[in-house]
């Protein structure tokens, strides 16, 4: 998701409407729980948010439960999306408060938490979790999960790093991500945040 990334992926501004609505139909036809739309970027203009809201209204006509991964929103922008019918927003903590500066320099951990709290106050369901394997300690994993316990997200994704060529973490050492360790992280997440979908 970084403009500095050299990963070999397709790059485009927006998915075209035909594909977006076709994907939405696929969700409904296969009785999937929700349609999650991912947008790469940290901030969007009000015009871009209005454009997204128009598409959300169209998809909500079919009763789809919609989630967006959309970066930071102003309260005004969040209200536009809420009124359009957006149900859930994904905004991951990614790591612990103390380790966060090692993985991100564009904003702070505190800004992420504040964004999530604002979204919760507006009535959005929250999807928030983290990435394991970026060089953090076991204590960092625990600290992140304790922060998530305070947030109580409806969904808590636990991602395990898969180093991708062309990204800053392409040479990350993930030898510690054994099956046993990954299962322990998932079990700890379940114990600390028992009501969230993992």
Identify what each model region corresponds to.
Residues 30-116, 120-128, 134-136, 197:
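Conserved SAM/AdoMet-binding glycine-rich loop
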Residues 23-26, 74-85, 142-152:
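Short amphipathic alpha-helices and their capping/turn segments at secondary-structure boundaries
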Residues 4, 8, 36-48, 99-100, ...:
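Glycine-rich, proline-tolerant flexible connector loops at the mouths of alpha/beta enzymes
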Residues 10-14, 102-107, 170-175:
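Short glycine-enriched, charge-decorated loop/helix-capping segments at active-site entrances
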Residues 37-39, 61-63, 110-168, 181-198:
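Conserved C-terminal portion of the radical SAM core fold
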Residues 1-19:
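Canonical Radical SAM [4Fe-4S] cluster-binding loop centered on the CxxxCxxC motif
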Residues 17-31:
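Alpha-helical scaffold segments that flank or form the walls of functional sites
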Residues 19, 49-54, 108-110, 141-145, ...:
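Charged helix-capping and loop-helix junction motifs
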